[in-house]
Amino acid sequence: MISVDSEQGISRDRLAELLNEDLAREYQSIIAYVVYSQVLKGAAYMSIADQLEIHAKQELDHALTISRQIDYLGKMPTVNPIPVKTSEDAKAMLRFDLENENETIR
């Protein structure tokens, strides 16, 4: 959560830093959704895999928006994602996805 002093506001550098943290999470999501959508196997997961492809594209749009904001602030967008957890187990992949989403919300 961003803490903003009502009188001082937030510095441009701090805002860019926080946006870069968000951008790193967007990259993480893109990579995870691309990988998970392709390696989930079985009829039970096909509709989920299709949705993950859609989410990957949405996350790319988010990453582009955040990158523009960082550039507007005169800073360089990060190129480093948060590490992506993978597994051979479909349920574990979906659990990782849920954990990532919960962490992003915090």
Where are the regions that the model predicts?
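Iron-associated oxidoreductase/ferritin-like identity signal
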Residues: M1-R106
